[in-house]
Design a protein with these regions (language model features):
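Mid-chain, structured segments of secreted extracytoplasmic proteins
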Residues: 59-87
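Hydrophobic alpha-helical membrane-association signature
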Residues: 77, 117-119, 160, 164
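Sec/Tat-exported extracytoplasmic proteins
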Residues: 42, 73, 85-89, 109, ...
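Surface-exposed short loop/turn segments
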Residues: 5-22, 79, 83, 87-130, ...
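Short secondary-structure boundary motifs at beta->alpha junctions and helix caps
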Residues: 58-68, 130-177
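Soluble periplasmic/extracytoplasmic beta-strand elements of cell-envelope proteins
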Residues: 32-39, 52, 97-103, 118-124, ...
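A structural "domain/chain start" motif
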Residues: 2-70, 177-191
Length: 191
């Protein structure tokens, strides 16, 4: 019986957010892809909506008590990136993998009344069968929140993930054509 009393009741005003479909036009990519993997560090491997109060506690991560993500940030990023980047495997079924490392996914308060959604990630194009890195690029975005609360953070994070997915798609699209004499990324991803 005592074990049951340690569970707290779910607050009546508990909110679960996602970053939802955004109706973007896909970014066509000629580099053959067979998959998109999105990974995040352990502190981002939960549904907690995290924030940081820079003036008072710049090194402390906090989580909203009454608000959660519908899934882990890496899952939500994966869905958006997968919808935005339009790529197919090579005709032989081969293709590279896109690996996205989510390094930061947080609402940062610079004052009590102002905050931004901060997202940092690294995208790597991995060769078929070897996972050798063929190309890599870091991306970061800070989007001001319309309100300094969890709901405002969701709006900013949604816009930020969307922008980073488009940027990653454009980066992949810009990898073609190959520079002088080198195998193109399309060729290397088709082996």
């Amino acid at each position: 019986m005592n074990g049951c009393t340690s569970f707290s009741a779910i607050p009546e005003s508990f909110s679960i957010y996602d970053i939802g479909p955004q109706g973007n036009s896909p970014v066509p990519v000629s580099v053959p892809l067979v998959g998109i993997d999105v990974v995040a560090p352990s502190w981002l491997s939960s549904s907690a909506m995290q924030y940081r109060l820079v003036p008072q506690h710049p090194l402390e991560r906090r989580a909203y008590t009454n608000s959660r993500w519908a899934g882990m940030p890496s899952e939500m990023v994966r869905i958006v990136v997968g919808r935005v980047i339009e790529a197919q495997p090579a005709t032989n079924g081969s293709g590279c993998r896109l690996r996205v490392d989510v390094d930061e996914f947080i609402q940062r308060f610079d004052t009590v009344d102002t905050s931004v959604g901060l997202i940092e990630l690294r995208a790597s194009l991995l060769a078929p069968r070897t996972d050798a890195v063929l190309a890599t690029k870091a991306f970061a975005v800070e989007v001001p929140t319309p309100t300094a609360d969890a709901a405002g953070g969701v709006i900013a994070m949604r816009a930020g993930v969307n922008q980073l997915a488009i940027d990653a798609g454009r980066w992949l699209a810009a990898l073609e054509p190959a520079t002088s004499g080198a195998d193109s990324f399309r060729t290397r991803c088709s082996r």
